[in-house]
Amino acid sequence: METTALLVCVQVPEILSIIYIRMPTMQQDTLRHFLLEAVSLLALYHPGAVIDSLLQKQLPMDRYVHCPGPTDGQEPPPAPWRPGERLALPRASQVPEPGGSRGNFCSLAVTLRSCGGSWGGKFFVDHFLRVLMEKLKNLGSDQPRTSSAKPEADEEEAALEPLKMTRAISVVVSALRSPEAVQHLLPELLPVLLKQISATVGKEMPSSPLSTRGKLFLKGHASDDNPCRLSLETLEAVLRTCLDGKWLWLLRKQGAWAALEDPRAHHDGVCLLTGVLLRAGTISLPLVLVLTRWLDAPSANLRVTAAAFFAELMKEPALQEWRCLQPIARALLEKLRDSSSTVRQMAARGLGNLVSGAPEKLRKHKGAVLEALRRGLEDVAAAEVVAESLLALAKVVTELKGKAVGSTFRDIARATKGFFDAEQASLRSAAFTLYGVLAASATRRWRSFFTEELGSTWASLVLHLRDPDPGASMACQGALRLCAPFLGLRRVRQGLAVNTRLSAAELLGDVCSQLVRSCAPGRDGAAGPSPAPGEGGSG
């Protein structure tokens, strides 16, 4: 095999079949080692053919090879392998008695670790992972079907193929001692695995009994019945190889893995993952360019993943450094009209995050951003889009101040008050937050208008001090504190500032008491809560 491995491409399946048959009959460890070495040699020269064969069945050779975890083994690596040199066999200590297996690629991975040095190991893993990634790309869920008349069993078998590729990547990466072989492939691995996660979120494992051959490869794994979890565990294995442990700890602490697996929170999980990867310095321009194309993908899941990724990325100046900010911002403006409400929500979040990542660009294109987010308030069929637009507008108006907001100030204020009594607590909280920002940002031009608006909204603000949702109640307190100067209610403003530890009921009682005192003739304060210029009135 050492002299002819390069010439036997056509015979690879036959050779592996012979090894498959003979391995259980081998009684001597030495002979098994020779067979494993033969498989390793074939894989070095014909990785595609070997991978195809390995994915077909649960290889008995896995029973005879121990696949250590990422931290197992303290021995120094062997001398580098180079083409033409004899491959060193695994030590006997690495081959325990027949026992459990961690997957079809375990034997191959351990053989590589034993016989592959710095050059051979990198060459092998690079080639091996590239073949797996290419196969996974070609099996993408958004690829058109070649035939609509496939038997159900064939369709379910085809659905298992990406999962087997994903599992293979996990096993190979987990068996490596050095991260170098994976680190330089990370910009290519990340989009492949993110795409697989997006394709499997909310899905179940194919259940056809005729698909058992493919399921053998996944059998015994913790995520047997959850294809998305399998993809997430593979991504975690890759990141564990490349990143410092503190970043993996942070992902777990923030609940990123659980969110990524949940169809209702997948977008938030992508934001958490992107934020950690940014801080770890693993977001690169090639990854950004790949995900840019996903924004217009036929798959809604891919568009959600891409929109959430860029919503978080908008917080950082990296897009400006790569000269990608303008096309991405333009794409997010367009995505506010996407058919997916989650995509629209993430687009609004991304535009709001321009405040942190590119405030000068926000000021330059403030008209388009304000108008787009104002239109988002009209998306009443999707409460999450409206809430995100309200919060984004709060950030944008705070940055621009009232003068730069222009005539849109009036439209935003009128639209915002319509959500004070919304059924969803997230809408009420976001509306109170934005209303307080509008009060703080109102310039002389808009003070008279805003005072008139408060004539119809102050009662609602007071009542929602006792909002059943704690977040909405706190946001209402902040808004009322900022609106109090427009009403001439100095005592109310002072009471809100001083009594910060009162319960909602106690605070409401205190504010009502202050209102009664303010309305009493001859007392400090106006005769009513709506002292617009040139107007009187009572509360």
Task: Locate each region found by the language model.
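HEAT/HEAT-like alpha-solenoid repeats
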Residues: L7-M23, G48-Y64, G84-P96, F128-L136, ...
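Alpha-helical repeat/alpha-solenoid scaffolds of the HEAT/ARM/MIF4G superfamily
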Residues: S170-T274, V288-V290, R490-R493
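Acidic, Ser/Thr- and Gly/Pro-rich intrinsically disordered linkers and low-complexity segments
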Residues: T30, L132-L160, T200-D225, L251-W257, ...
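Short coil turns that connect the paired helices of HEAT/ARM alpha-solenoid repeats
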Residues: R22-M26, P60-Y64, P98-G100, N138, ...
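HEAT-repeat alpha-solenoid elements in large eukaryotic scaffold proteins
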Residues: M1, Q27-R32, H66-Q74, S101-L112, ...
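Flexible loop/turn segments at the boundaries of HEAT repeats in alpha-solenoid HEAT proteins
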Residues: E2-V12, L42-I51, H66, P78-R86, ...
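Alpha-solenoid helical repeat scaffolds
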Residues: F34, S53, P68-T71, S107-T111, ...
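Hydrophobic residues within the alpha-helices of tandem HEAT/HEAT-like
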Residues: M1-E2, L35-L44, D72-P80, L108-W119, ...
